[in-house]
Amino acid sequence: MNQASYKNFLATIAPPASAEVLGKWGITTAQLLTSKVEELILPIFNEMDPNEISIYAVGGFGRKELAPFSDADLLFLTTERIEISNTIAALWDLGIKPSILVRKGGELITSVKRDLKFATTLIDARHLYGFELPLLLGPKEWIEKARPWFHREQEYERRIRLLKALGAGCQEPNIRDGRGGLRDLQLKHWLLKISEKHEMKSDSESRENNNILLGARTAIHLAVKRREDRMLLSDRRQLISWLGWENEDSFFQSVMLAMKRNAYGKKKKSDNRKHLVEEFKSRLRDVPLRPISGFLRLLDETGELELLLPEWRRIEGLVRTDSAHKYTPDEHTLRVIENLEALFQTQNNEINLSYLQRHDLLILAALFHDIGKGTGKNHEEEGTKSAVEFTKKFGFTKTEIERVSFLVRNHLLLSYNAFRRDIDDPHLIHDLAKKIGDVENLIMLYLLTVADLKAVSYTLWNDWKARLLDTLVSRLVRQCSSYLPPELFAKEAIIRRKATVEDLLSNSKSAEYISAHFDSVDGRYALAHTPEQIARHIQLIPELKKNAVVVERNQHPVSNCIELVVITHSHQGLFAEIAGTLSALDFNILSADISTRSDGVAIDTFRVSDSNNIDSSRWNSFVEDLKEVISGADNVENLLNKIMPYKKKSVGIKTEVSVEIDNESSGDYTIVEVMLPDEIGLLYRIASVFRNCEMSIATAIINTESEHGVDVFYVTDNSGKKIVKKNLLKRLKEKMLEIA
């Protein structure tokens, strides 16, 4: 049989019929693959002298747990040095990937003492060809003598392995190497084999979990046609298509639950719900003096949390398609509660946390905030229903129930508006404050938001997002206390900023410039910029008398990025020109703020990251290129064409493509949300579509952190009004989708 026929054999393997038979299918298929590989390789071994060599199947091959594209682990024991290169080449020609260890028979004991990996391979050694060594028969006396060493070395190896591989509770676990994966089960199997009672058998649940993971690993290999031991979201569609199951979630949830059971051991069975409820009530009353997260995690590990909260079983091991989430909803929820307890012990210089009085209600909201994800419906509303039912049964008052319900229903409110809406818009601040109601609601929602974001993944939360959220909440605290109309809120912001700027620029010559400047800007500009930034704008604007474009760069005081300020005369397509020039010099744009004075002076601020650092040469190139583009001496397309041949597009999860238009949230602007695959010059092409549709960008919120980032634009027509014509909005969507 040649390599092609082996691949044809793999193509004949039918998928399991359902999650219920995944384990049985997994072990049966692994044994079938093992037998097939043995059938292929034994004729090759028959050409060797059986008196000179002994060949053993080891590792997964030795256990008869072979996966389609995993290595066939072989141990060659020889009496003398012999030539095996032709044998190895013949194995590769079959389409089998051999992993071969070669030892002289007399070197075995020395190798075992020196090499833990080699020692463990011998535990499952299975004779295939040639002479047999008595040392590899029966219980492993040779390793029993070194049992303490074996335990110690295996634990060290496991700690190193788990640092590299995601496991139970993670959305994209490594089924082989992660916590609760096949390697953990193999370790348990090895320890049983070398225990004092080596005849003791592993429990049936461990065997079933092992078989489920074998089935999952085999299914992934066959579906994606390569060795892949991780359950990647990018492979999900291909895997679902190969399986052909009606219930798409059942495969992933079966795997996650098997890994969870492996990680925590056998679940306890308890029918004493009354005692459990009383203990939960007692611990909830003691928050924050006595943490409750450890108690809840223990209930989760023992399987008793679903006795307290039946909806919990729906989210256990549930894998969602959102690649931003590192953890499954059950693990994520427990981490949110742990994060809250940490926040209870911290101080925030920007936000006064003393408004928080009911820590217990916040813990309850965290427990229910994602519980609705198990229904497949709107998880905020479904979670709210569950929270209301639970708190009623537990005897909470109407006011307490309403507060918990508010938090669950609106747990995404602050993050959505902080990162996908213009927080410098006075109308937004007014509307949000009205919806939130009081400062205690706000502070509880703020803490829940921070804990939630930190529990999504360790990369999602950063200083920049913390600053945006703190800025929004600080403004909302003020608004919830005063309830100023948007116009007065904006006017107050201008007055406060102007007074501070006058202190910064305290000379008679500046007074005239300051008054003229604040007379020509709006409240949004005053909120968007610090007094120090505004003072610098006032100093730079007079330079327009000498130069058509004034450009300055500064290190941002909070986030690790560079702030570029471009001051020039406003014109159609200015945003596209700046964005395109930045892209052509390989700057990564994080955010952009576009402000235009009533006299037509544009003050545009771009925050960019640059892994290559901006040296004086690159900075001068940017300034010169921008001047030429704005003057018409050059164009962005020419600049981009110079670097495109040298830049590669990144390959990752298939990005959803969408363009959404919101004409309800803002009184003055049409909000356009764009989700397109990231590439060099994308922001320029998006801006060019707006320009070609005769629309002006007022604000841009750029998301560059994940494949599913949404860029948000506040736009108007050329007369500064919202875009309401349906045919123009339809054309905008069509043109945006054309650049995908």
Ranges and model annotations:
Residues 20-33, 168-177, 279-284, 314-335, ...:
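Active-site flanking loop/helix segments enriched in acidic
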Residues 212-213, 253, 258-275, 294, ...:
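Regulatory modules associated with amino-acid/nitrogen control
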Residues 1-51, 69:
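N-terminal regions immediately upstream of nucleotidyltransferase
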Residues 34-42, 81-134, 155, 403-410:
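Conserved catalytic core of two-metal-ion nucleotidyltransferases
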Residues 64-86, 241, 328, 352-482:
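Divalent metal-dependent catalytic cores for phosphoryl transfer on phosphate-bearing substrates
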Residues 35-56, 190-201, 324-362, 382, ...:
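Alpha-helical phosphate/pyrophosphate-handling elements in metalloenzyme active cores
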Residues 38-82:
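Active-site nucleotide-donor binding segment shared across nucleotidyl transfer reactions
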Residues 4, 16, 145-271:
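Conserved nucleotidyltransferase catalytic core and NTase-mimicking acidic/glycine-rich helix/loop elements
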